[in-house]
């Protein structure tokens, strides 16, 4: 668990900020907030993307490609350079020049920590569900008239943005554990949705991964609260340990989970949930007040995320009824069970195409279970998935679990591994997953052939999901077009 040389974020001058990888989900969000606060923002990214256009429109100067001269995009050198060390190599020419010029280089998490200062900080952490829970919290608090600032890892469908500099006191953000970045923050409210070993390429052992959440809980302000999901064993255990340490801790979850963990005071209990035509109707008791909310996004995991969002909003002064109104209006986040379209007429009539970021077995299980619930409620159709594994290390670590999770679908097409920052590993391909699956599955290493493979498998009223953290998202519109015109 090592990090490259980075400078301390203390006393950093944020008047001119250069962001390497500005098009990324996290970087683009902090760029928006800097611009809204009147800072000079420059940046670079390896390729042009739809993320860069709105940043340029509000004042950012951005170069495509990395070069030493990019540090002078504003006409003078920046006062600080921001990078994500997991994604940006240390020989990046902009990093090299920054160090030659003596310009401080900090992580994106350090910058976010600076932006959070002076706010009532609501930080959402956990192995899964951070983006959805953060987004739900934002929409709920906006409806309650709180106008929070926020920085999330996905684009809110309704707002069309991933960040906002609000007029209210609250700042809501994701707390990323993948490189221990969450230890940069001092939350007033810290939500932990779940804890399950991941990012072992960085942490090396599950124990080290678990420890970072304990350390995060220890950074909560004296009058703050830790909020844990009691349906998740490791999050519940974190809550119990925190209670014993004297950290103010509350829990949320279904009634049976609340009963199973009496040591953690429950402040949000899911009394009941059921699938209805509009989505999922849930009855939730928030600190003695029973409310009913309809969630448009399916799945038991989304009900838990919704309960967490309501509780977070309540703990920072939001009116429960108004928070519920906002949550009922939540239409999702880009790449989280995102609807791309449905087929009208022809042999695939009624088939619907969705895209999801799920890239861990637990996330895959949750999304496919939600899709299966929707198919069951409709009384027709099947669940078809096109899955692209993400990272060789994760594929090796969880090959058995991926096979089991994907087998919740009725049929699957599995693409080759998206390596991202990792180099290929001898003997490791997606076939170590497909060989263990128990449903009809096609291993398709040819990316461009996937829409055709799906057309050979899909039928009317099916839910077709593209799934993964890599380039598979590009296939959703292509599959829609293939089925519509087949």
UniProtKB/Swiss-Prot annotation:
Q: Keywords assigned by UniProt? A: ATP-binding, Cell cycle, Cell division, Cell shape, Cell wall biogenesis/degradation, Cytoplasm, Ligase, Nucleotide-binding, Peptidoglycan synthesis
UniProt GO MF annotations:
ATP binding; UDP-N-acetylmuramate-L-alanine ligase activity
Which GO cellular component terms, listed alphabetically, does the Swiss-Prot or TrEMBL entry include?
cytoplasm
Q: Which SUPFAM superfamilies match?
A: MurCD N-terminal domain, MurD-like peptide ligases, catalytic domain, MurD-like peptide ligases, peptide-binding domain
- What subcellular compartments does it reside in? Cytoplasm
Question: Which EC main class describes this enzyme?
Answer: ligase
Q: Which reaction does it catalyse?
A: UDP-N-acetyl-alpha-D-muramate + L-alanine + ATP = UDP-N-acetyl-alpha-D-muramoyl-L-alanine + ADP + phosphate + H(+)
Q: Does the keyword Cell wall biogenesis/degradation apply?
A: yes
InterPro entries linked to this entry: Mur-like_cat_sf, Mur_ligase_C, Mur_ligase_C_dom_sf, Mur_ligase_cen, Mur_ligase_N, MurCDEF_pg_biosynth, UDP-N-AcMur_Ala_ligase_MurC
Q: In which pathway does it act?
A: Cell wall biogenesis; peptidoglycan biosynthesis
Q: Name the EC number(s).
A: 6.3.2.8
Function according to Swiss-Prot or TrEMBL: Cell wall formation.
Q: Which named protein is this?
A: UDP-N-acetylmuramate--L-alanine ligase
Recorded source organism is Corynebacterium glutamicum (strain R)
Q: Which gene encodes it?
A: murC
